[in-house]
Amino acid sequence: MEYTAIEPAVRAFLEEAEGIIVLSPAEQAALCARRDEGDRAAGEALLRAQYPMLGNLIQHLPRDFRTPELTARLLARLREITETFDFCADAGFGRVFSREMRAAVREWMQENGK
C-alpha cells in the first residue's frame, strides 16, 4: 500500500477520537533516524505513534467501518506486528502490515455481517 495524504477528517478521527498520533513519512523517517542515533525520546515517540499506512487503510475503508471497535482491533494487530518487525529498517514490514490488516478487517466484517 502506497502512502497518500490522509484526509483531514480521517486524521481528526484518529488523533482526536482514538488518540492516535499520525506521522507523515518524513516525520517517521526523522524519528527513525533520531532513534537509531540513540535518542530515547524519539524511540518512545515512535512507540506512541502509529504509521501512515494505518491512516491510509482506514481512509480507504467505507465510512461505516470507521468505528472504535475496528480501530482497536487494527491497533492490536499492529502492535503484534511491531513486536516482530522494525518498521524503520525492515523492508518486509509493508507486506506483513498489508496482509495482517486485511485479515483483521475481514474478521471484523464476518463478525459484524458486513
What is the role of each PLM region?
Residues E2-K114:
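Alpha-helical promoter-recognition and RNA polymerase-docking modules of transcription initiation factors
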